[in-house]
Amino acid sequence: MKVRASVKKMCDNCRVIKRKGKVMVICSNAKHKQRQG
């Protein structure tokens, strides 16, 4: 899980979602998981 000020899609499988007010990226590639903070 990467924590970044700006989260971006890193590939076509990445999905930008909101969970509990936090912007997150979920992906089939675990290295692409990100959370805003």
Curated annotation (Swiss-Prot):
The alphabetized list of GO BP terms reads: translation
InterPro entries cross-referenced by the UniProt entry: Ribosomal_bL36, Ribosomal_bL36_sp
Query: What keywords are annotated for this sequence in UniProt?
Result: Chloroplast, Plastid, Ribonucleoprotein, Ribosomal protein
Q: Which GO terms describe its molecular function?
A: structural constituent of ribosome
Which PROSITE patterns does UniProt cross-reference here? RIBOSOMAL_L36
Q: Where in the cell is it found?
A: Plastid, Chloroplast
Disulfide bond sites: none
Does the record carry Chloroplast as a key word? yes
Q: Does the keyword Cell division apply?
A: no
The UniProt entry's sequence similarity note says: Belongs to the bacterial ribosomal protein bL36 family.
Q: What is this protein called?
A: Large ribosomal subunit protein bL36c
What is the source species? Chlamydomonas reinhardtii (Chlamydomonas smithii)
